[in-house]
Amino acid sequence: MGAVIALVIGTVPAASAEEKVLNVYNWNDYIGPGVIANFTKETGIKVNYDLYDANETVEAKLAAGHSGYDIVVPTFVPFVARGIEAGLYAKIDPSKLKGWSNLDTGILAAMAKNDAGNQHAVPWIVATVGLGINVKKVQALLPNAPLDSLDILLKPENAEKLKACGITMLDSPSDVIPVVLHYLGRDPNSEKPDDLQAATDVLLRIRPYIRKFDSSGYINDLANGDACLSLGYSTDIVIAGVRAKDAKSGVEVSYRIPKEGTLQYIDAMAIPADAPHPDLALAWIEYNLRPQVMAETANAVNGRSGNKAAQAMVRPDLTANPQIYPTPEVEKTLFTGPVASRGYDRLRSRAWTRIKSGT
């Protein structure tokens, strides 16, 4: 990942009075390999870089207060948007960031719906929730598998046949439930109890065939051939394909945006309201607004950058891939997640517990 990596141990290391230390909390495999080391070399700021694999983990730490983190990178909707309402994030003045003009104005406009004036968050990576498929293994068990449809996973007769080669699903109700609602032709932002029950019923019917719910380890499961079908994040699944190719194991992993449409999400940099080093956090944001820096990250994570100026430096195989940079036609089928009320969030979490336990 980078020069200074501190695994999550629940607390952020203390710094001496003399040294400058920035505490960053980000997703696993979500930054260019040289970004941290080069930032430290240029600025003299040491980086403690902790990892998480669920938005809920970040939200809980920030809500508890005194997390010690200066930069976090949660999914903008619903997590940053909800955190803004709760006062969890500090304001960022775009006029003080030289690289702000490098950002994609379309993405900023989408974020402004939940953050007026774009005062709290800076786009990092834009991606989708979709299907990771080992095509050879899937077609061996299901010759006429609908590779471009959620039917491959959500129809029990298909999931039952693919159980033998391994099915995984994101352990994230805020990502999965809206996708299932959209698949059913219902409003993915709905908080109606009967809609939640309908999505729960669909997932309970395929629960016996899901090997595990996981939001990070499935990358290696796909890359190693231990899983043949995953509902996951586009960036993770493309990384799995790259790892499989590099290993020369004969495993091929394909990412597909379902034809029914799916969730598109924006992960964004934000500064916690009680960040101990907000000035260093701004230096980090400014550094990462450079096109060449953000392009390095986009190339490493195989994702779509929120930095428009970086696009010319992103690998052509990524920018030409409609599964990563969707066509206008596909864009029309995508939706952003809801900012769920606290009450609905609790109901959805209870439903998710039922789904995972199969009861």
Say what each PLM segment does.
Residues 1-11:
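Bacterial N-terminal signal peptides
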Residues 68-72, 90-135:
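A structural signal for short loop-to-beta-strand junctions that line the ligand-binding cleft
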Residues 83-91, 109-110, 115-118, 209, ...:
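Ligand-binding "clamshell"
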Residues 18-83:
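Early extracytoplasmic/lumenal segment of secretory-pathway proteins
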Residues 267, 272-333:
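Mature extracytoplasmic/periplasmic domains
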Residues 220, 328-359:
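Conserved C-terminal helix/tail region of periplasmic/extracytoplasmic solute-binding proteins
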Residues 165-180, 184-254:
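Ligand-binding pocket segment of bilobal, Venus flytrap-like solute-binding proteins
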Residues 90-101, 151, 247-263, 272-275:
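Short beta-strand->loop
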